[in-house]
């Protein structure tokens, strides 16, 4: 089984508008409300792929109850740790091919709630094969909280796919317990390394060769419409993707993480992992609903993705 972790979940509310006008009323014909936060997007896609998945993290209040009911309705197993605060809403306004997001920061977690979660997390880690951790840490938790979680995973020799950024990621990379996979984009790489990172192959190779990434088995860099660049131990790969019509890009990175996690879970080859990851990310972008893929289109798109060792 795969364990997904969402420490700062939300209800994602998507408003589709032809035109978004400031300082006036905008009326919405369609509203989509889904359990959100990066880890729950990963969860939904893994479920649609057909993998056994269990969702955990922190939930509280009426919004937390809504998320659990929604997961129950689609048959996704979950075992969250309760908190006293109210889980957040996040709003995405999709307009004229653009996306404007309004993100609530969410509840503040107490020291005791953090401690209880780590004990709960350890009990779940013992039962699963691989762990996928995604998104930001909520207020109140120390910046090295993910490091503590990865130490637990290392203790039980369980692989970890980590998708976070900023100081939380830096703390993990500076620590002794390393994730199996990280998935930064070029902007995040630039911040981590304090150097300009472009999509140029030689620049990416030099960036991924930095000491900061020692001990991380996979570094997969998202390049948007240009595909991806990856380092697996000592091998480098360029991933080229076909042009597609993008309907809703929200959650495509999370769908990519689902593909990475699924491929590791099934012990697939490097090429299969990179193709699966990018294929699921693209399938998500073709759907209105966040964290949703149409598996009927999977095989045809999978075959159009090219992976080249460089």
From Swiss-Prot:
This protein's gene is called lacC
Does this entry carry the keyword Ribosomal protein?
no
InterPro entries referenced in this protein's UniProt entry, alphabetically: Carboh/pur_kinase_PfkB_CS, LacC, PfkB_dom, Ribokinase-like, Tagatose/fructose_Pkinase
The enzyme's first-digit EC class, named in words, is transferase
Q: Name one GO molecular function term.
A: tagatose-6-phosphate kinase activity
Q: Which PANTHER family match?
A: 1-PHOSPHOFRUCTOKINASE (PTHR46566:SF5), 1-PHOSPHOFRUCTOKINASE-RELATED (PTHR46566)
Q: What is this protein called?
A: Tagatose-6-phosphate kinase
**What CDD domains does the entry give?**
FruK_PfkB_like
Which EC numbers characterise this protein's activity in its record?
Answer: 2.7.1.144
Q: Cytoplasm as a keyword?
A: no
Catalytic reaction(s) noted: D-tagatofuranose 6-phosphate + ATP = D-tagatofuranose 1,6-bisphosphate + ADP + H(+)
What's the family? Belongs to the carbohydrate kinase PfkB family. LacC subfamily.
Q: Which GO terms describe its biological process?
A: D-tagatose 6-phosphate catabolic process; lactose catabolic process via tagatose-6-phosphate
Pathway involvement of the protein, from the record:
Carbohydrate metabolism; D-tagatose 6-phosphate degradation; D-glyceraldehyde 3-phosphate and glycerone phosphate from D-tagatose 6-phosphate: step 1/2
Lineage: superkingdom? Bacteria
Cross-referenced HAMAP family: LacC
Cellular component (GO) terms are: cytosol
| A Pfam entry, by short name | PfkB
Swiss-Prot/TrEMBL keywords: ATP-binding, Kinase, Lactose metabolism, Nucleotide-binding, Transferase
